[in-house]
Amino acid sequence: MAFLKKSLFLVLFLGLVSLSICDEEKRQDEDDDDDDDEEKRGVFDIIKGAGKQLIAHAMEKIAEKVGLNKDGN
């Protein structure tokens, strides 16, 4: 009976150790994914800002071609 208790204890202990190792690796992977997401958001913000500037500049040029100016004349 004591042998079974020790064996069961050993199996449970090893299971918990392997589970904690897997959780730790999972957290590290999630942290790496978060860093990648932040980089993607940063690049998207830069592209979005450049697009807004490009559209604003294009609208000004179109307004000049049509004959409208900022003074409303």
Swiss-Prot record:
One of its GO terms (biological process) is defense response to bacterium. Residues 23-39 form a propeptide. Expressed by the skin glands. It comes from the Eukaryota. GO terms for cellular component: extracellular region. It is found in: Secreted. Residues 1-22 form the signal peptide. Keywords: Amphibian defense peptide, Antibiotic, Antimicrobial, Cleavage on pair of basic residues, Secreted, Signal. Belongs to the frog skin active peptide (FSAP) family. Ocellatin subfamily. Has antibacterial activity against Gram-negative bacterium E.coli ATCC 25922 (MIC=120 uM) but not against S.pneumoniae ATCC 700603, S.choleraesuis ATCC 14028 or against Gram-positive bacterium S.aureus ATCC 29313. Shows no hemolytic activity and no cytotoxicity. This is Ocellatin-PT6. It comes from Leptodactylus pustulatus.
